[in-house]
Amino acid sequence: MHIFKNLTEPTAVTHSLSCNFTGERNLVLVKGSQLLQIFRYKDDIPTKDEAPRLELITEYYLDGTVTGVTRIKTIDNYDLDSLYISVKHAKAVIVAWNASSFTIDTKSLHYYEKGLVESNFFEPECSSVAVSDEANSFYTCLLFQNDRMAFLPIIEKGLDDDEMPESGQVFDPSFIVKASRLDKRIENVMDICFLHEYRETTMGILFQPKRAWVGMKNILKDTVSYAIVSVDVHQKNSTVIGTLNGLPVDAQKVIPLPAPLGGSLIICANTILYIDSSASYTGVMVNNTHRQNSDLIVSRDQSTLDLRLEGAEVCFIQELGNTALLVTEDGQFFSLLFNKDGRRVASLELRPIEPDNFILSQPSSVAAGPDGTIFLGSRAGDSLLVKWYHGEPESQPEETLDDGNESDDDLYGGDTAQTEDTTNRPLKLRLADRMLGMGPMQSLALGKNRGSQGVEFVTTTGVGANSALAILTSALMPYKRKSLYKDMPGGQFWSVPVRFEEEGEVAKSRTYVVSSDSENSYLYYVDAAGVIEDVSLSTKKKKTKKHFVSNVTTIFSSSMLDSALLQVCLETVNIYDAKIGQPHKYSLPQGTTAVEARVLGNYVLVLLSDGQVKILEAVSINKRPFLKAAQVSIEPASESKAIGIYATDSSLTFGAPSKKRTRQGSPAQDSRPVVVVCYADGSLLLQGLNSDDRLILDASDLSGFIKEKDGQLYDAPLELVDIALSPLGDDHILRDYLVLLTPQQLVVYEPYHYNDKLRFRKIFLERTPTINSDRRLTQVPLINGKHTLGVTGETAYILVKTLHTSPRLIEFGETKGAVAFTSWDGKFAYLTQAGEVAECRFDPSFSLETNWPVKHVQLCGETISKVTYHETMDVYVIATHKTVPHVVRDEDDEVIESLTPDIMPATTYQGAIRIVNPYSWTVIDSYEFEMPAEAALCCESVKLSISDRKSQKREVVAVGTSILRGEDLAARGALYLFDVIEIVPEKERPETNRRLKKLVQDRVRGAFTAVCEVSGRLLAVQGQKLLVQALQDDLTLVPVAFLDMQTYVAVAKSLNSMLLLGDATRSVQFVGFSMDPYQMIPFARDLQRVLVTTCDFAIEGENLTFVVADLQKRLHILEYDPDDPQSYSGARLLRRSVFYSGKVIDSSAMVPINEDRFMVIGVCSDGSVTDVVPCPEDAYRRLYAIQTQITDKEAHVCGLHPRAYRYDPILPGTGNSPHRPILDGHTLIRFANLPRNKQNVYANRLGQRYQQLIWKDLELISDLFKKCI
């Protein structure tokens, strides 16, 4: 019984599309093939280069694996683009923007899997590909199973703009066509596209009639063909316009080019080909491997570039008309010029581009935006928004690497004025915006959190020069924390800055601190050194007297008139001058008490116990402050009593949005005083304090969006703890959000306008605060330049929004909790539950663009493949490798002279081990492996016993390597043991006080693929043999036990004397280790063919289960139960559950939740962090019932059903049927985001007494790390 949840969302971009989706130019992104995000290009943000940036509009987590995104236009909404999204296993969905609800609507769903029973339909290489006719927007095509095409005809727009079919349909029925029906030669389709320059719908189809690969070049060569086919979808017939045969077998994809250039590009591994409308071609060779692998003759030879085009992306620059941007997998940039001879493209030419101070690795997609911008998505690092521009003209044009007399094409081509003007002006790229990317995460280590007593999570990210360590913390940790006062009484406190003038002196400022408990109030002040002192003690020393009223409870305090201190008590409102002289007291109406108070300018708004709002005005008479009844008032918006009030200066407009602009062109932010009042029946009043602007909204149900009150409200009373209209964001993008805090949850609404009326839509929160009626909402000072909102409590939170994210809750990492937040002199301060006042800062190097704060540290410019934590010396040890040319060697490591020395060599890896200091995050020592092409496959810090006679343990770093010599030679490797020793640091570098010392080097046949510690001994997997070795006094390793393994052990995990071994092809094996006598005891194994990527133990009390992740993106829960008949007396592991996670989990670690519960946290290739949590039986039953109701009753994004996504019965090798499914944390957290009536309906089906228990059960999902920070 387990729960699966994403702790952080995917960050690796897999698809991108620039379109007009919401009525403005948008960028649509898919991250990790699951997270759909809609951005707008913001050109009104003042930046250094006046380049646009990206702002997130909305995002959705999809219950499906996206394989393609393209845009179409439909007759019912022709001014906007709709999205055609293809999903794994031949599914497609069409969505459009709904401006009234500020969300997406599913317009059409298409499933094409019925009747397709071929086994390869579900293979990964047969995933579906979506394309659309962007030139005419009349058709879409979904390619799946390599040779089946599903066409969806879109009804064309007639001459009358208002012409719509009587049925209201916008699509004709879709149908499936086998590729061979278009032309009998077409099979094994590799890629398709719709071509642009044709009057009728025309497709370009890249296919391979005879399957082959480069290794078959002596038998089959150039087996790929390209066909241009005119398709009449309505008549269901086709005509082949032209065919081009004999293309290289390494052709990858076809890219259509817009008019007036037209035609298409075919990207091969070694060449780029341009195909015109008559199926004629021209091309450019980018390396000298092309001549070996293909007989195709190309017009231009630029083989000295030595490019590899596998994974390259191309973006055509429409503004230039004859230039495209080429980005290679290793991050090189080139401009691809189409040199014309008249209207014919005569040749292609590549010119290198030097980027301006940015790096890109493994591009996944490109999208051309407005104003010369191009978005570059990446799977292995940050995704970038760049802007192209022309540099200064070159004084002497570079010589092109032509083959023969191809320069004639350049002399007579390019007759347009623009081409002539820009030919000798190099294309350059400037960074406009950067989006955080953390994929792929390959290794995970748990280290000491230097900001608290908990742990920090360190993982490897990126590839090559973009590789880095990512330091993640489950909470926003205080940085440079300073304690200011101990044992401050009361559970509330406020800082009150005031100004006062002494006779003949310049005005001074002082900050008072007011705290209160249930009986008394206390006054302090902050001295010049930042120390808090009790006013009563300081006045005794100076023999002065303060008149602060202390024998009452204070519910609110603030500064007023810039020089007065306000104290709102239960029955009176007191105001003091800056020296705390005799106060002026204003008594509240008899029989009422103050419940809540706010200050807005010179006004004090007090919410009384009878539900009325009393407004007072502060005035100064003879330099003394006084309070009087204000002339303004608030007319009640409901017959029920007011239960919450908030007042602030806001730029929200209740009617049509303001069209005012600043001189820079950005929208003018004219703020005005606004009061928000919430009533018990759910009515919500927004009123301008000094104007007639007034808006009454219906928030009774806390539904997905709230609008003007126009009918009956939800009948259940609304329980409200606090309310705020708070600005979130930074100085560039700052927007007021409506925040409601109830006893169970936090609800955040974002404002938007529809039909010139203000509405609010609910923001989906991935976590909800724990149940606590003592929580409060507090405006906190800027955190690293961002406006945030604090949520106090035993576990406090910060509500944060960045330019690229929606508002999200991030836990505040104070272990003592925070019952109040405040600030003085721009410093962040808070009061803990223990009565300690502390101030702190926050590390600016941590990014807040994920659910967990993350810090990226680039170290050595090499790929970091492994990381481990050395606890004794408090350092991290990493394994890195770099790409080097492959040198062919024989069995004796002698170099074999190449028969083709002029051909671009293959590449291999050369590895190293390095120490990273966790305080400076720099590399302080390295060990380069001696053998050529030797790289680490595993690296672990282990504590080994020294001989059997001593109880002493020594922590060392065990490294297993492989010498990458090629598949024709037997594998070789080495086992290293390194000690981390303390040395005298270098001068002016105190962090260099650690060094690696090699203890053991054992070079043998076979690669060392996994190492770990078991009962103080070292376990190492060498080839297909597992060895357990003991460390002796002379620091040598002696084998004490062994076990034969199956194929390739990819991971080994230990728990005391128990071992879990994961095989790359044969699932897992559960093994025990005994020391008296030494022996390996095989307990049980899984007999299914599971391609294991990582595995670990999951513990709940006395229950032990195994969590296994595989390459097919599944999670398996296995159990060892010898008493179960299906286990064959314990010989087989029982499969208790199978769950499709939708991501490849590359590494995992067991993390304690409390003393008897451990969860498994994993890092994924898409840049996300996940966890699997054991769940108690009673909580599991309740949550399973809630999940079932949400799955069955609620509408799902894009119509994709969670149950069909998570459980796929077609996947082979699942073994005996699971009887306890893993709970989906994302589906469960939707309960906290449902309207109140649905929450009550679903909870009441379990029984009324379970309602509160369900909220506590959700803490299993949202607050797992309170003990870890």
Curated annotation (Swiss-Prot):
GO terms for molecular function: RNA binding. Keywords: mRNA processing, Nucleus, RNA-binding. GO terms for biological process: mRNA processing. Residues 416-425 have a biased composition (Polar residues). The keyword rRNA-binding does not apply. It comes from the Eukaryota. It is found in: Nucleus. One of its GO terms (cellular component) is mRNA cleavage and polyadenylation specificity factor complex. Residues 393-427 are annotated as: Disordered. InterPro entries: Beta-prop_RSE1/DDB1/CPSF1_1st, Cleavage/polyA-sp_fac_asu_C, RSE1/DDB1/CFT1/CPSF1, WD40/YVTN_repeat-like_dom_sf. Residues 395-412 have a biased composition (Acidic residues). RNA-binding component of the cleavage and polyadenylation factor (CPF) complex, which plays a key role in polyadenylation-dependent pre-mRNA 3'-end formation and cooperates with cleavage factors including the CFIA complex and NAB4/CFIB. Involved in poly(A) site recognition. May be involved in coupling transcription termination and mRNA 3'-end formation. Belongs to the CFT1 family. This is Protein CFT1. It comes from Yarrowia lipolytica (strain CLIB 122 / E 150) (Yeast). The gene is CFT1.
